[in-house]
Every structure is written in structure tokens, then in C-alpha cells.
Amino acid sequence: MAQVTDGGGGIAGLTAAERERIAFRSGTDDCTAWHYRGSNGACVVMAGGAGVTKEPGTDRFAARFHAAGYSVLAFDHRHIGESGGAPRHVVRIAEQLADWEAGLDCAASLPEVQPGKIAGWGFSLAAGHLLRLAARPAGQHRLAAVIAQAPLADGAVSSPRALGHETLGVLARFPLIALRDAARGLAGREPLVVPLAGPRGAMAMLTTPDAADGDRALNPGNRYPGWQQTIAARSVLPIALYRPGRTASRIKWPLLAVISTADQSVLAAPGLKAARRAPAGEILQVDGTHYAAFLDQHETVVAAELDFLHRHLLHDDSGQDQAALA
């Protein structure tokens, strides 16, 4: 059940009445979310990638979905952003999947939302989580549709390519830092953090050429000064080995995969493969790298995502437009 913590804007032109900060329980901690109250009965639950908080990761897309009538629940995973959980900056895949389950349950409890009209929207790592979650049998999730934007579909394929952009010195030192941080975790000590992205030669999670676009795409003009853009070193290896696209053939619900053709961070091929294996998979390919949907291809992607949501959340089985009938 959602608890209102306060109202607030944060997006130009958006009033506190249109967006309020709420919290929902996941495990023993609270996840903090923005709730945009919609008018058409459908809801989009949203989250960003590894270490990407809800504001830079979802604000621009959430505002467009809300303007089209959708409710939105955009949340921070535990240990990240405004959500609870200690230690900070740690990504635990099983916990983040549980956060998604709790977020979907929260969305279903919102008074204006019809529980059968809930879609998930994820970017990068969060998109991978949705591939994994949607592959579960009916009754084990609340998803009616999924948008996977630049999905991390197969870390075992994309990570070796990403490592090719690193220097030998970093390749030798980073595993030692990650192991040291893992040992700190076992001892209950605070994590050693590294930047989410950096130039070649930096001790960062990603040093692919397109990783440098992240700040420009998600945080233009330092719009979100509180976003720390770091991750625990102990979290990098589990993400690198994460392969959520392998179960895509079990996804029976509508899936839209938004694939950047020149993506150097998660690669295009694994996401394409996953979407093609999904029985109800749809693919939008756009020119550009990992952050294309936030940059030059933004309007194209928003239009395609709204069309997908409209077709799969606002039409009944007879094909009638429920929004028009309301």
C-alpha cells in the first residue's frame, strides 16, 4: 500500500497536485516514488538503470506519459536515491526484482488505476529486470505490457565488448577493487564506490565511448545536482554476468524493445535477439548509441512508446478504444 510522503514538482510546469512523492514497502525498507495521477485507468511503472535515480532516468518520459492520460509510478530501487536500504549505492539484482514486484503491487492499489492495465517501463538494467519479470508465469506478476528501452539483455555478451574499451592497467586493478569491496560487504562495511561512467583509463563501471553521453542525456545543465552517479564496486560483476534476455521466449505479454543500433554499452544484438524470441515482441530500432532515446531520437521513441501503450492498455479485446469510449 502506498503512503504519501509529500507533494512536489521537479519538472517545469508540473504542479504538486499532478505529482506527489509516495513510498511503498519492499522487504524491510521503503522505496520512494513519484506518483503522477492519470485519467485513463492505465499506469506505467518506471525505473532507471544501474545507479540511475528516478528523476534523471524517468522524468522526461513520465511527463509525456502523464500528459497522455496515464498514471505513472516512477521509483528508486532500494539502496539508491531516496529509497531506503543500507549500504548505499549497492545493486542487488534479486532485491531489485522484488522492488519491481512491490512497485507493481503499489500501482495496482492506486485508486485511479485498473489493476489489469499496468505496464512496466525500464531503461538499461531496469529494462533487463522487466525481461526477467515478464517471463514468469501468469499470476506471478502484474504486467500487462513491457517497454524495454536500451535493455541490458545479456551481460555476458556485452561486458567483454565493453571491457575492450578499457586500458590494461584498469583491467588488472578493477577486479582487485571489486573483490576488496565484496570483502567489505561481508564484514558489514561501507562500499567502495566507483563512477557509473568515465573516459578510457578511468576506474569506472563503464568507459565505453557512449557512456560519456550519460550526463548530457540524463543530467543536462546539472539539472539533478543530488544524483551522485556512483555504484558500489562489488555490484559491477553481478551486473556484468546478468542474462535476463535468455528467458525471453517465455514472455507472453506485449513487449516493445527500443534498440539503439550503435549501442556500445549493452549492445544492440542481445536486445534484438530477446525481442525476436518473445512471442508478442515488437522492435523499434533507432539510430544512435545507448542514450539515443534521451537525445536525438527522443520524439521518435516517445511517439512509438505512446502508440504501444495505447494499443495494449487502452483497447479492449474487441479492439475498441476505451479512452475514446470513456
Spell out what each predicted region is.
Residues 2-38:
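N-terminal cap/lid segment of alpha/beta-hydrolase-fold proteins
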Residues 90-111:
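Alpha/beta-hydrolase active-site loop
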Residues 251, 257-259:
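Short beta-strand/loop motif that positions the catalytic acidic residue
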Residues 131-217:
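Alpha/beta-hydrolase-fold enzymes
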Residues 64-84:
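Conserved alpha/beta-hydrolase
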Residues 50-63, 77, 269:
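The serine-hydrolase catalytic nucleophile loop
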Residues 264-270:
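Conserved alpha/beta-hydrolase "acid-adjacent" motif
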Residues 288-302:
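Catalytic histidine-centered segment of alpha/beta-hydrolase-like enzymes
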